[in-house]
A protein has these predicted regions:
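Class I SAM-dependent methyltransferase Rossmann-like catalytic core
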Residues: 5-19
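Conserved alpha-helix/loop element of class I SAM-dependent methyltransferases that forms part
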Residues: 17-34
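Class I SAM-dependent methyltransferase "Motif I" SAM/SAH-binding loop
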Residues: 41-43
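Class I SAM-dependent methyltransferase SAM/SAH-binding core
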Residues: 46, 50-87
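Short conserved loop adjoining the S-adenosyl-L-methionine
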Residues: 87-93
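A short SAM/SAH-binding and catalytic strip from SAM-dependent methyltransferases
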Residues: 98-109
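S-adenosyl-L-methionine-dependent methyltransferase catalytic module, highlighting the catalytic core
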Residues: 112-117, 124-218
């Protein structure tokens, strides 16, 4: 999800935003021309650069890694150096149409607090995360008795940045409890069995990666 890959046979010289076409369509449905986009943990700025080229968006990234910040500057992507664990207090309410949080929520010390802060500054939030409820993770933990590792979660338990792992069901229940509306949701799978499980409706068991677009429920 949210990796910028180049497929010139399909897009000419413009890179696609997602490896999964469903997710690409889902996100772009919430991005109009000249939309104000905030990319939290923007990396080298490739996503914002692509959206700027495709949709003429007004984008800004937040990143703490200095090398990534330099890459953003070389791509002419506006970027702020900031640690997301310290919040977004210096950003005004309703400053953005959409915020993007890509594979980052599970790394935060206060995931709920960050979500609330993001929804203060943006109307919609697009979140991607690895689903800890996937069948392969469950079976690995059951039969091996150790913290599972996968392509999405490749770290050892003692050096992982993922300090708040959660499942798809955990996420939907959090949204219900906090009065958040799930506008759209998409799933991406590499494994055939994961695709089958997701296809028959067992999404918490089948989904490997999740993209959700959320907003505050209107009072």
């Amino acid at each position: 999800f949210l990796n910028v890959s180049v497929d010139k046979s399909k897009t000419g010289n413009i890179p696609t935003i997602f490896s999964d076409g469903v997710a690409l369509k889902l996100l772009q449905g919430f991005i109009h021309e000249k939309a104000r986009i905030l990319d939290l943990g923007c990396g080298d700025g490739s996503l914002l650069a692509t959206l700027k080229q495709q949709k003429q968006i007004q984008g800004i990234g937040i990143e703490k890694d200095e090398k990534s910040i330099l890459s953003c500057i070389h791509k002419d992507v506006p970027v702020l150096q900031k640690d997301l664990d310290k919040g977004l207090n210096d950003i005004a309410e309703n400053s953005f149409d959409l915020a993007i949080l890509n594979r980052t929520l599970q790394e935060m010390r206060d995931p709920l607090g960050l979500l609330q802060e993001i929804l203060r500054v943006a109307k919609y939030v697009a979140i991607t995360f690895p689903n800890f409820g996937n069948w392969s993770i469950r079976t690995a933990l059951l039969f091996r008795g150790r913290m599972p590792k996968s392509k999405e979660l490749p770290y050892e338990w003692y050096n992982t940045p993922n300090i708040h792992l959660f499942t798809l069901r955990d996420f939907t229940r959090l949204c219900e409890k906090q009065g958040l509306k799930v506008e759209k949701m998409a799933f991406e799978n590499n494994g055939s069995f994961s695709k089958i499980l997701t296809g028959v409706g067992l999404k918490n068991l089948g989904a490997e990666r999740v993209l959700a677009i959320i907003s505050k429920k209107e009072s």
